[in-house]
Design a protein with these regions (language model features):
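A structural signal for multi-pass alpha-helical bundles of membrane permease subunits
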Residues: 2-251
Length: 251
C-alpha cells in the first residue's frame, strides 16, 4: 500500500535516477521531434515539383512504420565499431576521429544518438499533419502579402506559422500524453554500460520485476501508478497553458 510509495520517494535512489532520465529523454525528444517535423514540413511545402515532393515525403514518413526492433538493428549495424559500421569508418577515413566511437555504448554519446534515432523514426508522422495544415492555407493570403511587400521570411512569420499554431499545439499535447512511455525505444538501444543515463521508469520496472530474483509486484505497481499520474499532470498542464494562450484547449 502506502508503504511502497514511502519507500519509493525516500529510500530508492535508483527510482529518482530513472525518473530524471524519463523526464529528460521524454521532453527533449518531444521538442526535437515536433521542431524537426515543423521544419521539414515547411521545407517540403516550398518544393514545387510534385513528384519529387511526394518521393521525399514518402522517404521521411517510411521509418514511422518500422518497429523499434528493426530500427535499433539498423542503427546498431551502421554505428558499429567494427568494419560494418559505416559511420565510424567514414569519420576515421575523413580524419575526424582516430578510434571508433561506441555511440550506443558510451554515456557521452548515448543520449545524442537516442535523440537522433527518435527524430529519424518519428518525425514523418508530424510532418504529414503539418503539411495537411499548410495545404489548407489560401494562396490569396500569400499573394496579398507579396503585393504589400512582404518577403518570404515575413510571410512565414505572419501567415504560415500562425496557421500552424493550432496544429503544433495539438500534436504537442497528443505527444505529451505519451511522454512517459519510453520503454520500447529505450529498451532496444540501452545496455548495461549506459544504464545510468538510459534507465527510465518503464525499464526500471521491467528490471525490478523480471531482472532480479526478488520481484516485488506491489512496488512496481506503485511506480507504474506514479508514472501515470505524472503523465496526466503534464497533459492537463499543457492543456491549461493552451487555454491561456489560445483561449481554448483540446481536452
Amino acid at each position: 500500500g502506502l508503504l511502497h510509495f514511502n519507500t519509493m520517494f525516500t529510500n530508492d535512489v535508483f527510482f529518482w535516477d530513472a525518473f530524471r532520465n524519463t523526464l529528460l529523454l521524454s521532453i527533449v525528444k518531444l521538442i526535437l521531434n515536433t521542431g524537426a517535423a515543423v521544419i521539414i514540413s515547411l521545407l517540403l511545402n516550398e518544393i514545387t515539383n510534385l513528384a519529387f515532393k511526394k518521393t521525399v515525403q514518402t522517404i521521411v514518413y517510411l521509418p514511422h512504420f518500422m518497429s523499434w526492433v528493426v530500427v535499433a538493428s539498423i542503427f546498431r549495424l551502421i554505428l558499429s565499431v567494427n568494419s560494418s559500421g559505416m559511420i565510424n569508418q567514414m569519420l576515421m577515413g575523413m580524419g575526424v576521429i582516430d578510434n571508433p566511437i561506441f555511440f550506443l555504448g558510451d554515456v557521452r554519446y548515448w543520449r545524442g544518438t537516442f535523440f537522433f534515432i527518435n527524430v529519424w523514426k518519428d518525425t514523418g508522422w508530424g510532418t504529414i499533419l503539418f503539411l495537411a495544415t499548410l495545404s489548407g492555407i489560401s494562396p490569396d493570403l500569400y499573394e496579398a502579402a507579396q503585393i504589400d511587400g512582404a518577403n518570404r521570411w515575413k510571410r512565414l512569420i505572419y501567415i504560415t506559422l500562425p496557421a500552424l499554431a493550432n496544429t503544433i499545439i495539438t500534436v504537442f499535447i497528443l505527444n505529451l500524453a505519451k511522454v512517459m512511455n519510453l520503454f520500447e525505444s529505450v529498451f532496444v538501444t540501452m545496455n548495461d554500460a549506459v544504464v545510468n543515463v538510459s534507465n527510465v521508469l518503464q525499464t526500471y520496472v521491467y528490471r525490478k520485476t523480471f531482472g532480479s530474483g526478488n520481484s516485488d509486484y506491489g512496488y512496481t505497481t506503485a511506480v507504474g501508478l506514479f508514472k501515470s499520474f505524472v503523465g496526466m499532470i503534464l497533459v492537463l498542464g499543457c492543456n491549461y497553458a493552451s487555454k491561456k494562450v489560445r483561449g481554448r484547449g483540446i481536452v
